[in-house]
Amino acid sequence: VAVTGKRGCLAVLGTALLLAALLAIAAVVAWRHYLHFADTPVPASAPSVVIAPGDSLKATLRKLRAAGLVQGAELEWQLLARQVDAAGKLKVGEYALSPALSPRELLTRMRQGRVIQYRFTIVEGWNFRQLRAALATATPLQHSINALDDAALMARLGFAKQHPEGRFLPETYVYQRGDSDIDVLKRAHAAMDKALAQAWEQRAPNLPLVSPEQALILASIIEKETALASERPLIAGVFLRRLQLGMKLQTDPTVIYGIGSSYDGNIRRRDLTTDTPYNTYTRTGLTPTPIAMPGREALLAAVRPAPGEALYFVAVGDGTGAPAFSATLAEHNAAGARYLQRRRLPSTPQTETTP
């Protein structure tokens, strides 16, 4: 009987060891399967997925399934979320579903809030009409200002009495899904305020400018006159010397701005003599408002002009975009004649009333 009992115990022990071995093998296989799931890139049929406020891991997983990411059981996703400390910590936003992204990397990004970043660029020299048109087509921004006129828009921003022209700094602004056009404009407005204040603090002494607002106006004119950074301080010097002497600025971009949306790409002699608040051929001093969005270099040029004696400048016409600067009207007319000769047009000497 004792032998039989001993054999029975050995049989039970053997069975237990076999079961333990099988369970261990199964555990190893399951773990390897889990690791393969967690660390193998999986393609999706959609480019992105959006986690909305209140979405749980289960809700997010349903969205991933709908986006074509079908690998892995729900239990594996739950285990992985705990392993990467993402359980209950997924951040709201839009996430890219890259073919090279593994589930582990995806959940880590969702925990860290590494959402898709979009970019909107305000181009130097744009006017506010152009800015609004570009902003209206930016996706996936939420659009809330399309029905507002400029005055109502500025009131919405908190600047009810401020003209919008020139008030938004040309830069590239990063945003994400869920942001609005108002969010972008607020940031661009704050950036311009800061850039203008910094430029004004660096202003040269004895400028004929009494406020940062005047510097902004002049910077916008400089911005429209040239795209060459090296020429901006020189052009600023011409305009500032003319202001000091009480001379009219006589610059075409201000006339074009005054013409408005009816401008057809050509500026005619009658345009130079038709008075508008922005016609610097008929009016002395700066324009009532900026005429464009000046960049940082134009802002700095307006308050730190290059030294010199030039009171005039005209296009050289050599394809570089660089102007010729002159200290006297005679020199200026000669430079203008050379420019017109390059264009094979008849030269008309200018008078003291034209730059």
Q: What is each model feature region?
A:
Residues 2-45:
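N-terminal type II signal-anchor transmembrane helix
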Residues 8-12, 54-59, 79-83, 92-94, ...:
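A broad, low-specificity signal for short, low-complexity segments enriched in glycine/proline
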